[in-house]
A protein has these predicted regions:
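Surface/interface-facing alpha-helical segments and adjacent flexible terminal/loop regions used
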Residues: 1-59, 63-160
Length: 160
């Protein structure tokens, strides 16, 4: 039955499981009723979802930085704003343990692949660095200012 409810109505299932876990925490004996396999799966998925969200936000930020580099005469104000928002949102969701699993080089490769296939006014981007110039410390910026975006752009030019 728990497996059927998990598949049919995950919201009801999660409410019931939360209630059972609260009762268990108060010392009641409810072990048999808890859908342990799915509870464990859901707890694990929370961490994965958060990591994927941060990876996505960082990829989008890098994408906009690469657009700024690739088309210096493009809509820079918009791209700068987008990069700042994505970096800020990523920093807000960041947790220290993510450092072990998030690889800036992979995020950069994804963003570079997207931007390298784009055109702006029928023009391809200026040459984009092949190697990721960023560390996680460069990218996790709680409230990025214009100067932070400028510093990240300089990394693309100088490789620093």
């Amino acid at each position: 039955m728990p497996d059927d409810l998990y598949t049919a109505d995950i919201l009801l299932w999660s409410d019931q499981q939360a209630d059972l876990l609260r009762r268990l925490a108060r010392g009641e004996r409810v072990n048999d009723a808890i859908d342990w396999d799915h509870v464990i799966e859901e707890v694990e998925s929370v961490g994965r979802s958060e990591r994927h969200a941060v990876e996505s936000l960082l990829t989008r930020a890098i994408e906009h930085l690469l657009k700024l580099h690739g088309w210096p005469d493009g809509p820079g104000g918009h791209w700068r704003h987008e990069a700042r928002v994505f970096l800020s949102d990523a920093a807000a969701r960041w947790t220290p343990s993510m450092r072990q699993t998030i690889e800036p080089a992979l995020l950069y490769a994804t963003a570079r692949g997207l931007v390298s296939r784009m055109t702006v006014d029928e023009r391809p981007p200026a040459p984009l660095p092949a190697v990721c110039p960023y560390t996680l410390d460069d990218l996790i910026v709680p409230r990025p200012a214009v100067a932070d975006i400028d510093a990240l752009l300089a990394h693309l030019t100088t490789g620093v």
